[in-house]
Amino acid sequence: MAVSKKLFVELVTPERELWAGEGDMVIAKTVEGEIGIQPGHVPVLALLAPGSVVRVLGARESGEVRAAVHGGFMSVTLSDRVSILAEIAELAEEIDVERARAALKSAEREALGDAEMRARVARARGRLRAAKAEEAA
């Protein structure tokens, strides 16, 4: 099988398609660890880690698409198609950093061992990681 030069990547939630386009590489954190996908990668179905950042390198004029992702799956096919199917996701440029900081502080105050609160903290931290990387670009 000939290796294509680009991946087709789509990032979707139950509510909408956040982004779709071509990229050179996808980097995502799964429950098993971080994974990098390039054209020609073997098929994969992976569970995304809560509060993680998905990066699509070689996309857009800026060269990168970043999104905060909380839960979901990543599917990679033989045809170099990568689907990020997230329960909750936001593109970095959509994240209000001050609001995300406030959400993190609130979640940290309330997170005294409750699994739902720990998930809120992870989601807030992921949003800030994605947004901060966007600010630096």
Swiss-Prot record:
Gene3D superfamilies linked: F0F1 ATP synthase delta/epsilon subunit, N-terminal
SUPFAM superfamilies noted in UniProt: Epsilon subunit of F1F0-ATP synthase N-terminal domain
Ion transport is among the record's keywords: yes
Any one of the GO CC terms: proton-transporting ATP synthase complex
Subcellular location: Cell membrane
A UniProt-annotated Pfam family: ATP-synt_DE_N
InterPro entries: ATP_synth_F1_dsu/esu, ATP_synth_F1_dsu/esu_N, ATPsynth_dsu/esu_N
Family affiliation: Belongs to the ATPase epsilon chain family.
Protein name: ATP synthase epsilon chain
Naturally occurring in which organism (per UniProt): Thermobifida fusca (strain YX)
GN (gene name): atpC
